[in-house]
């Protein structure tokens, strides 16, 4: 079988959730949308459920996958519902929903629910994506709070630039949210991963950690808090061929790398169809049997090439680590002009293996 594999450390996942709880000083919904950022929503939710306050997903399809797998904890639909018929499923499966548009508010007000629903009312405080204007937000709260089909309301907003620690936008959003929500008796939710890791003055009742759960740093530099994150995914493959190139010979499409010395080249079973960044530059580091080696040549659909010249002991079958504890996915993403979110979510055909911890053997493969 092809040797590319992503190893998922479930104990690291639990560690990062506990860190989010500690930094937030509040309840926390573990965000497992997009298949838990490429880590597998069901096994990640199963690992976290004994201690998680709940989960958050993008849409009802993702929530139903968790319910069908036996997850009983609260699940919030971050985009709410797209069709009125989904409200019946929300009630049937005891889901929580965001209300972020006037249409969703009207639908909730008209819905004769068989059980009261828990609704998260979302205000647009400056993201200008989903969310009610401050005026509509207050009007929606007044409209929904007394209805029998509404069990409770949580007031939420989303930070647009919290990953920029020197940007005033986060403070501006927090002030706008506080001014509008002032006097409304309800729990609040404001902090996402960068809000938890980089903005300690922010306070809320519910945090929504996403990227940080998986051990990735949302900032371009390390901080005291991000240094405590543990990478959850380790992406590995193996060398499938070794060849020697003389001076002047190129490697790969477009001859982006030309040997300036006699070069020992390792071909690795990993390409952009697996989710490795296609435009990773020459010199991007990987680990070959624990030794740093530079990527050379253009990344192909199914393969990439590395320079083994300085590590003559490396041969066919050597383990190649593309990201994990080293190299970290965040710096790799920056080097390749993509985001860590994109890399983690992009592993479409790489099989995942789940381990209880980095020091414990494999427990399951999916």
UniProtKB/Swiss-Prot annotation:
Substrate binds at residues 129, 301. InterPro entries: Ala_racemase, Ala_racemase/Decarboxylase_C, Ala_racemase_C, Ala_racemase_N, Ala_racemase_pyridoxalP-BS, PLP-binding_barrel. GO terms for molecular function: alanine racemase activity; pyridoxal phosphate binding. It catalyses: L-alanine = D-alanine. GO terms for biological process: D-alanine biosynthetic process. The keyword Isomerase applies. The keyword Glycosyltransferase does not apply. Its EC number is 5.1.1.1. It is an enzyme of class 5 (isomerase). The modification N6-(pyridoxal phosphate)lysine is found at residue 33. Keywords: Isomerase, Pyridoxal phosphate. Its cofactor is pyridoxal 5'-phosphate. PROSITE patterns: ALANINE_RACEMASE (PS00395). The active site is at 33 (proton acceptor), 253 (proton acceptor). Pfam families: Ala_racemase_C, Ala_racemase_N. Pathway: Amino-acid biosynthesis; D-alanine biosynthesis; D-alanine from L-alanine: step 1/1. It comes from the Bacteria. One of its GO terms (cellular component) is cytosol. Belongs to the alanine racemase family. Catalyzes the interconversion of L-alanine and D-alanine. May also act on other amino acids. PANTHER family: ALANINE RACEMASE, ALANINE RACEMASE, CATABOLIC-RELATED. This is Alanine racemase. The gene is alr.
């Amino acid at each position: 079988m092809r040797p590319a594999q992503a190893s998922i450390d479930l104990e690291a996942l639990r560690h990062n959730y506990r860190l989010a709880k500690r930094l937030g000083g509040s309840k926390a919904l573990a965000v497992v949308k997009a298949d838990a950022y490429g880590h597998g929503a069901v096994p990640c939710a199963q690992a976290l459920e004994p201690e998680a306050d709940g989960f958050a997903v993008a849409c009802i399809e993702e929530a139903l996958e968790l319910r069908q797998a036996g997850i009983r904890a609260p699940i919030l639909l971050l985009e709410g519902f797209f069709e009125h018929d989904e409200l019946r499923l929300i009630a049937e499966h005891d889901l929580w929903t965001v209300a972020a548009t006037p249409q969703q508010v009207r639908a909730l007000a008209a819905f004769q629910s068989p059980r009261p629903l828990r609704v998260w009312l979302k205000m647009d405080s400056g993201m200008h994506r989903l969310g009610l204007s401050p005026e509509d937000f207050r009007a929606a709260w007044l409209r929904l709070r007394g209805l029998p089909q509404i069990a409770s309301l949580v007031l939420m907003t989303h930070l647009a630039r919290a990953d920029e620690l020197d940007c005033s936008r986060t403070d501006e959003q927090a002030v706008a949210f506080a001014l509008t929500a002032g006097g409304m008796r309800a729990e609040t939710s404001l902090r996402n991963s960068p809000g938890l890791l980089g903005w300690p003055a922010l306070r809320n009742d519910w945090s929504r950690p996403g990227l940080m759960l998986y051990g990735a740093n949302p900032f371009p530099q390390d901080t005291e808090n991000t240094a405590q994150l543990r990478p959850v995914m380790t992406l590995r493959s193996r060398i499938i061929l070794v060849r020697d190139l003389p001076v002047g010979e190129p490697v790969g499409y477009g001859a982006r790398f030309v040997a300036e010395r006699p070069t020992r080249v390792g071909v690795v079973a990993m390409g952009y169809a697996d989710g490795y960044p296609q435009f990773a530059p020459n010199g991007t580091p990987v680990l070959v049997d624990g030794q740093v080696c530079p990527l050379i040549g253009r990344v192909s659909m199914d393969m990439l090439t590395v320079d083994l010249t300085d590590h003559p002991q490396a041969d066919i079958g050597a383990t190649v680590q593309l990201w994990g504890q080293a190299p970290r996915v965040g710096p790799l993403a920056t080097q390749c002009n993509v985001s860590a979110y994109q890399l983690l979510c992009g592993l479409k055909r790489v099989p995942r293996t789940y381990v209880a911890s980095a020091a414990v053997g494999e427990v399951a493969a999916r």
